[in-house]
Curated annotation (Swiss-Prot):
Residue ranges, annotated region (Disordered): 201-226, 240-500, 513-736
Segments of skewed composition (Gly residues): 316-363
Biased composition (Polar residues): 201-210, 254-269, 473-482, 513-540, 573-586, 656-667
Organism field: Pyricularia oryzae (strain 70-15 / ATCC MYA-4617 / FGSC 8958)
Annotated family: Belongs to the palI/RIM9 family.
Main localization (coarse): membrane
Protein name as it appears in the record: pH-response regulator protein palI/RIM9
Record carries keyword Transmembrane helix: yes
InterPro entries reported for this sequence: pH-response_reg_palI/RIM9 (IPR051380), SUR7/Rim9-like_fungi (IPR009571)
Length: 736
């Protein structure tokens, strides 16, 4: 093991070897001379003449024979022969130098131990011996120089090398001692300083009283039950943590799809007789596709639906076989009120096409009664979808827009109805949700259900997300309810919408009047004579794009030509000049100029927020003001002609790079839920509508009162006085 004294030992070992070689010179080893001249070799203990043919005995100093041998050659040495013979005795210094070097080498070996190496005195002795050894070695070399100059041999130079090594060993011994002394002096200074030595710290620690340890009761050790003897499990749990491959901060917010916006993925089912697409059904969950909690059963779009009248009360008598939920009917289209009441749509009709299933009358004149007030039960839940069944007239001939005889089809509803655009063969959610079994009575024809009037449907919750369909602009419905998308130029302009422009296609489809395939206009639904009270069941005006009939109103308004110039009306951007002239000069069926269907220009207004044109409203409900013409738009006479603007001057209808071109075209965040009503100023319960005078008159007229239930099982209490239908509504959905 290396120690600080190791270099010292190495140097002294080398010096001792060199001095030993010089001592063993001629005549002991004839090959090692200290000096050589005219065939005579010199050593420490004698000499040899005639090329080592004859040697002197081993002794200290040279005898008289050397002088005789060098009688004629003595003048060639620097010293006379007598002086050289006297100095030859000093050659004994070579063995002394070797001996001192050996002693110093032994001391250096002892300095490798702990006690001598940490003793300043021992190292001091080593250093002193080293100095003495250096002096002796130096003296031996000087004797060689004096005796043999200028005929020195290589043996004398070995003594010089040994002298140098002894000097270096003395320096090493001095350094060792100096290091040790400095270390001890520093330690002494530290011991004298109480703060540096830590004495004060330990004194303070000793003064602090340690609280006695509490003796906890020992629990007896039971083999296999408790105790550290049988518990060989580690006292702590170790876990391995893997580095995340991707940080959450680097994941885009739109990486996860919020919901399946089109759950009705269509596929062919070979088991279906009609060969149409099936509607897949997902398992019910506690939330809809937008994350909003639901209380009742939902359809495939996550919209809450309530069961139909027959599904909610399968044990009721009559059903739609002529009796409904009220008294036995004697004909007419009425099949009973919606769920929650027991009155019909009026008194039974008389006469008509003949008896219906289980009924005693046929298709008679229109009923003369009003709507029966609600009796037992409650109003249908919001979003209730009335049962859509075929009309009894199918047995006698299909009405306009219906299928072949005996085939049941779903009665088309308004665009706002939940069943809009859906296949007639699609099963309802209410029947699937309540597990109603198919009975023979389900195949019987039934009169169509009038849709609710506009404004009577419950307002959707504020803040609920609504996904717009790509073609209709309404909540998504199966795609088979619309005609297939034609080749490019469907929306005009020679530009095809991409698949990502779903919202734009839906808005353009609504504003250009594209209707679902296979359905007829609302004006063709009612084929019978309607009485004055029956106007309550008429459908509201269909949505008409804004500014479509302004030209018609302008033509009927005196001075309209002077207010708005025809060139200043919005025209399609990609329409040619010929199309513009035709659209301005050729009046349509309603007297308004015909709009070009090749236009890409559309109003950037959501359909449900657009105000219908007053000119297209039907007969106004009694008690309400008639249609009003919007005020004229006073534009400067010399204003720019928007029809003359080339493509690209306005906001484009579609974009090649981005799905959205303006803020109004951006979709609604499907995951946004509004705060409680108490935290949203301006949002509160809708004000109650004032009762209509005509409704009050009809309710007070006994001719429009429905009789109480007759023949019901167990009977039922008579209708409570004071009940009436909701003002402004065509359905007896609840109490006022």
């Amino acid at each position: 093991m290396l120690r600080p004294a190791t270099p010292l030992a190495v140097l002294l070992a080398a010096a001792f070897g060199l001095l030993l070689i010089s001592v063993l010179s001629t005549p002991i080893i004839k090959a090692i001379p200290l000096g050589e001249y005219v065939g005579v070799t010199f050593g420490v203990f004698g000499y040899c003449i005639n090329n080592n043919a004859r040697c002197s005995p081993i002794e200290i100093g040279y005898d008289e024979g050397l002088a005789a041998a060098l009688a004629d050659k003595n003048a060639n040495f620097d010293l006379p022969s007598q002086a050289r013979r006297t100095l030859s005795t000093i050659l004994i210094i070579h063995p002394v130098a070797a001996l001192v070097t050996l002693i110093m080498f032994a001391m250096s070996i002892a300095a490798h131990f702990h006690s001598p190496s940490h003793s300043a005195r021992y190292l001091l002795i080593v250093f002193i011996v080293g100095l003495l050894n250096f002096v002796i070695c130096l003296l031996a070399f000087l004797v060689d120089v004096l005796l043999f100059v200028p005929h020195m041999a290589w043996g004398s130079y070995l003594v010089l090398a040994a002298t140098i090594l002894v000097a270096l060993s003395g320096l090493v011994a001095c350094a060792m001692r100096r290091t040790l002394v400095s270390r001890k002096a520093r330690k002494k200074r530290i011991e004298e300083n109480a703060e540096m030595s830590g004495e004060n710290f330990y004194n303070r620690q000793a003064q602090q009283v340690t609280p006695p340890a509490e003796n906890k009761p020992t629990v007896p050790v039971v083999s296999g039950a408790n105790g550290a003897v049988g518990d060989k499990l580690p006292s702590f749990a170790t876990y391995e943590k893997r580095d995340d491959l991707s940080s959450e901060d680097r994941v885009p917010l739109t990486a996860n799809s919020p919901a399946n916006r089109s759950p009705n993925a269509q596929y062919n089912d070979p088991n279906r007789p009609d060969g149409q697409f099936n509607q897949p059904r997902r398992a019910p969950s506690g939330r809809d596709q937008y994350g909003n909690p639901m209380e009742g059963p939902t359809d495939s779009y996550g919209v809450q639906r309530a069961p139909s009248a027959e599904r909610m009360n399968p044990g009721a008598r009559g059903g739609y076989r002529g009796r409904g939920y009220g008294p036995p009917g004697r004909g007419g289209y009425g099949y009973g009120p919606p769920p929650g009441s027991r009155g019909g749509y009026g008194p039974p009709g008389r006469g008509g096409y003949g008896p219906g299933p289980n009924g005693r009358g046929g298709y008679g004149p229109p009923p003369r009664g009003g709507y029966g007030p609600p009796m037992r039960g409650r109003a249908p839940p919001p979003g209730y979808q009335y049962d859509r069944r075929g009309s009894p007239a199918e047995a006698y001939g299909p009405p306009p827009g219906q299928g072949p005889y005996g085939q049941r089809q779903q009665s088309p509803g308004p665009p706002s109805a939940p069943g809009y655009g859906m296949n007639g063969s699609t099963p309802t959610v209410s029947s699937a949700a309540y597990g109603h079994q198919h009975t023979p009575s389900d195949d019987l024809p039934r009169a169509e259900s009038p849709p609710p009037l506009p404004g009577t449907e419950p307002m959707p919750p504020v803040g609920q997300a609504v996904a717009m369909d790509a073609k209709t602009g309404s909540p998504q419905v199966p795609q088979n309810g619309f005609t297939a998308m034609p080749p490019p130029n469907r929306f005009g302009g020679g530009q095809q919408f991409r698949d990502s422009d779903a919202d734009i296609q839906g808005m353009v489809g609504l504003q250009q009047g594209i209707t679902p395939a296979g359905q007829q206009p609302p004006s063709q639904r009612h084929q019978t004579l309607m009485s004055e009270p029956s106007h309550y069941s008429q459908e509201g005006p269909q949505y008409v794009p804004a500014r479509q009939n302004w030209n018609d109103q302008r033509s009927k308004t005196p001075g309209a030509e002077s207010v708005i110039h025809p060139s200043m009306m919005p025209q399609p951007l990609n329409a040619s000049r010929t199309d513009l002239s035709i659209s301005r000069n050729s009046p349509g069926p309603g007297g308004a100029p015909a709009r070009s269907r090749t236009s890409e220009y559309y109003e950037d207004v959501a359909p449900r927020f657009a105000t219908p044109d007053p000119s297209l409203r039907g007969t106004p409900v009694p008690g309400q003001a008639g249609g009003r013409i919007p005020p004229p738009i006073n534009l400067p006479a010399g204003g720019p002609d928007f029809d003359e603007m080339p493509d690209g001057s306005r906001s484009p209808a579609a974009s090649e790079r981005s799905t959205f071109t303006s803020i109004s075209q951006r979709g609604i965040n499907p995951r946004w839920n509004p705060p409680p009503p108490s935290m949203m100023p301006g949002y509160g319960p809708a004000p109650q509508r004032r009762p209509n005078r005509n409704d009050m008159l009809l309710n007070s007229n006994p001719d429009f009162e429905l009789p109480t239930n007759r023949g019901g099982r167990g009977g039922s209490p008579p209708r409570a006085p004071g009940t009436s239908m909701i003002p402004g509504s065509a359905y007896p959905n609840g109490r006022l």
